[in-house]
Amino acid sequence: MVADLAQEALDIMRKAADKYAATGVADHEAMTMAQMKSGLTMQLLNHSRAASGAEHLMAHLVEMQPPRFENAEGIHGECVGVGTFACIKEYHRLASLPTPKAKPFEPLSEAWIREKFGDRLAPGIIKENENDVLATFDPQNIVDHWDEIRAMINELPSVEEAEALYKGCNA
């Protein structure tokens, strides 16, 4: 049910983006409906994972302004858009690789977190990751389901399709 609702939200938003790219006319009603359905998926799961992923992590990185990113700027949606394009490129690159080997989860060290995020952000990041869900994930699942993962990635727009859509939307 939640996956279907998330897909429905995505389909509505993609259709609105295609319309905007073709006509320059924004379908605010459709975009609002897509956002509401996306929000509902989060409510149903009591978590934002249904509507956000790695692309949002990139946006949050810009918003947090860690060392070396102090001058980064952009509104959340812009950053998510850039993150989405970067993720599409990386996902397609990964899908072109042979089946990976399972590698056990290794949490980031406190020293690494402090080095990358600085004293201002490190305590919150360390606390947020105390019970990292990845520690409960069996990496063999990726190996066992690699063909299915590739198939899902191949349902994403190609890098060229995404680039054309972004250009059509003046993004």
Please name every model-derived segment.
Residues 86-171:
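Mobile late-domain/C-terminal helix-loop "cap" segments
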